[in-house]
Amino acid sequence: QQLAEFVNTPHKNALLLTALHQNFNAYASKLDASQKNEWTKVKGRFQEIVFAEPVEHLLYMAAESMANKYPVDVKQANAIYEIARQTKFVSPALTGEVMRGLYPLDAFSAVVLTKAIQKYGQNERSLFSFLNSKGANSLSDFRSAHNRTYNLSDVYDYIINNFHSYLSDVNEDSMGWSAILVAIERIETADWQDEDIMKSALEIVKVIGMLNLFGNAGFSMPH
């Protein structure tokens, strides 16, 4: 803050330019209220110029790194890509070839995961951490099956487990995440006769929640 104030004097004829790997507020996420207030003062001395790398570019790099790593169900990958394209969920710049390279991620899960990482993580670093991670909810631990990709429900679980500290703070998406949690709690506390149906209901709620949070303005939900 002192450095910013020093530079922010016209007669000094100086410019302070910094590069951050995440937004200003993210650095203060684990501070107490008093420290967050001080950090807000620091932020006020700067003008933020946000650079968001195109989702298509990040997914192209991811597809290149995943080449031949997983067996591809071409028919399934193409079918899901066509739905994503027709509903305008993906940009025309994102090709079917790239999507096949990302399998077992499908077109919806790949785009949502990347957008979430851009918002809550560290762009390329977080994306490639996901691609190479081990353990619960990871891609390496996922076993694809007939009619089963690493889908939006899986992405929801991964985001909740890996970005919980950020999501637990107030942010622009707080209401959306809260709505999903409320819906999940209602499902889990309902009287279900069939556990498999309950699991399916949970997956549907997670999918709808992810589409609502990360769908672009031109996206229309498929019927």
Identify what each model region corresponds to.
Residues 2, 6, 65-68, 116, ...:
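Generic, well-ordered alpha-helical scaffold segments in large soluble proteins
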